[in-house]
Amino acid sequence: MNLSLTQLSVPPTDAEVDAWASVLTAAHAADLPGVPVPTRVEIAGRLRVAPTTGRHVHFAADEGVASLLLFTDAGNAHTASLDVLQVRPDARRRGIGTALWHRVREELLAQGRTSVSTMADLGGAGQAFAESLGFENVLPLAWYVQDVQDVRDVRDVATGTAGAEHGLPAGYELLCWEGLVPQAWVAAAALAHGSMEDAPTGDMDEQTPAWTPQRLHTVQRLVLDRGGRMLMAAAVTPAGEVAAYTSLVLPDPAAPRALQYDTVVVPAHRGRGLGRAVKLRMLGEATARFPALCEIATSVADENTPMRAVNAALGYRRERGAGIFQIKL
């Protein structure tokens, strides 16, 4: 088909953002009717503020959009992430998605990439399209959701006085920070972040760069620059260690759903209930600071049994299956 594809301005204009949001919200409403749609604040932030791990290239047609993240760190210069490829529901099966993919593939090859990955929900149009192109599911996972209205009785942990009844053993203190981790704790937090190296990654080509204090602050600042808010709850020791932490992001502070980002327990401190403790503290802080918050969503790899058990104990329910799909070029 003769389809006109354009590359968005840098930064995109208001009209370009509106057109992009129109496609995404229409596709989301059709494919995930029970999940809150991404807001314009969230969409504009992702389009206009460059990521920390690479550079975005955004392609648009009248009825479809695609967003490609080309990693720029040395360890990932061979791969990329297809963050978005969506077509308006009433315009599907007309070759628009295929045309967008061909343009994306041209860009990948021109940039010397040998693979690309994307996240897709299982059983939906995204999985079917990805598999038709040759993508394979290299990391099965699922989305889980916690209804905070059902668990507001744990709000007392927001006071910072939570004890053993909330899973915090003696010798630890719970702290919570909004925005950037304080300078006094950023080195310890970055060191703890490195413990995620043993988190399941399946057969993904993408490698996680080393976590440094600078990188941690850069990633956190990106959330803020895109219009969001971020909380981190941590279990710390008298020696100045961050033994465990969890991060919560509100891409749009006015939206009803927040995203649970990383939850990490440093290996030397595992088996003591710290994962549950920091998540309870985070829940208390989030419900106290954001009264309009209705639910928290997180994705967990199927093979990450310990974290799935922690989430189940805190009332998370499985919302939908998903996976990281990857193709070699």
Residue ranges and their predicted role:
Residues 127, 244-246, 259-260, 272, ...:
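Conserved N-terminal glycine/acidic-rich loop preference
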